[in-house]
């Protein structure tokens, strides 16, 4: 497989869209919604049911607080921190971790307008 196709396929697996997350929530599919933003950001706007674990705390807390067998959807503001955390989690054996593309900003704008945009 050529490198570009391989990279695109891996990225697709590492990301999930806000709309796909909404469908999973509506269907009652079990997964952990992991918010890796800072506490002040979480207080400003967050998705219902999200677990706050700031990015800087992930390495010291992930193995104690997260289940490597569970699907984990990682959320941040725009998707950069969540992609970094997702890559780290995958390296640590959390093979079902995915970053929500566009972060809570995309969620607010495309799925749930009640969640504040900041």
Q: Which residue stretches match the model-derived regions?
A:
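Rhodanese-like catalytic fold shared by cysteine-dependent sulfurtransferases
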Residues: 1-32, 39-71, 80-118
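Short, surface-exposed ligand- or partner-binding patches at beta-edge/loop junctions that are enriched
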Residues: 74-75
């Amino acid at each position: 497989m050529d490198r570009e196709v391989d990279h695109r396929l891996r990225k697709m697996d590492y990301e999930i869209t806000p709309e796909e997350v909404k469908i999973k929530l509506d269907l009652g599919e079990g997964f952990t919604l992991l918010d890796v933003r800072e506490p002040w950001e979480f207080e400003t706007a967050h998705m219902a049911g999200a677990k706050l674990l700031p990015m800087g705390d992930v390495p010291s807390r992930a193995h104690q607080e997260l289940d490597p067998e569970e699907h984990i959807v990682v959320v941040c503001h725009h998707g950069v921190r969540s992609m970094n955390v997702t890559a780290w989690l995958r390296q640590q054996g959390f093979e079902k971790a995915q970053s929500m593309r566009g972060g809570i900003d995309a969620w607010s704008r495309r799925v749930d307008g009640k969640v504040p945009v900041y």
